[in-house]
Amino acid sequence: DASPEWVHRHIEQLKPVLQRNSDVVLCLQAGFIGVWGEWAFTDHFVRGPKTPEEHALRKEVMIALLDALPQNRQIALRTPMFKKRMFLDSYDDTLTLATAHNGSDMSRICAHNDCFGADASDMGTFTEAGAREFWQQETKYVMMGGETCQISRYCKCEPSLKDMEDYHWTYLSGPSNISDRWETDGCYDEILRRLGYRLIITDMHHTPKPQAGESFRMVLELRN
């Protein structure tokens, strides 16, 4: 991976592009550090960090990314541990209805799991007590997405549907052998239907004969 200096230079180069095109950015996975940009197996950042001090270089990258995007866009971290070690005192410090969607850095840090259903810990995604519960609470208010990476008993239909509901998944990609398994086992259509937002207009009322220069009133009833 690139050195911290080069990572920050890359982010500065991307900042005007991200700002200019933020309207088509769902969220931004933090990336930049380690193999696959998943913040592990790094040559230039501390490998296997445990303390806030060992996370300091990563935190600087995260702060730069938060600055590179407008306040109404979120940055996704690969594991719940990273948010805790860089910004929080414990896994109990979750977002709430009162602290979500207020433009603060904490309200803009979301989640991505790039080994959904791969094994008991999702290949190191959940390695600490409280980590799962933390993301289950946080993702009520921030994006949750990622990808699958290998076949296991944890990506069968029943556990997959439960995890997607528990963690409020919005988007998912990954190898086709897993989606093929879901299709064979009969849950693919439900997963496809429930991912993300499907806003449907159930009723609509508007000013019947609007005139140029006059106010126009519309009432929409939407269902997700």
Feature map (PLM): residue ranges:
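Conserved aromatic-histidine-acidic binding/catalytic patches
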Residues: 2-6, 16, 49-57, 189
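Structural beta-strand segments of beta-rich domains
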Residues: 214-218
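Short amphipathic, basic-aromatic surface patches that mediate peripheral association
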Residues: 222-224
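Catalytic cores of secreted or luminal carbohydrate-active enzymes
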Residues: 155-208
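Extracytoplasmic/secreted proteins, especially bacterial periplasmic and envelope-associated proteins
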Residues: 6-9, 13, 57-60, 64, ...
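Substrate-binding cleft of extracellular glycoside hydrolase catalytic domains
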Residues: 1-31
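Catalytic-core regions of glycoside hydrolase
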Residues: 20, 27-38, 42-178
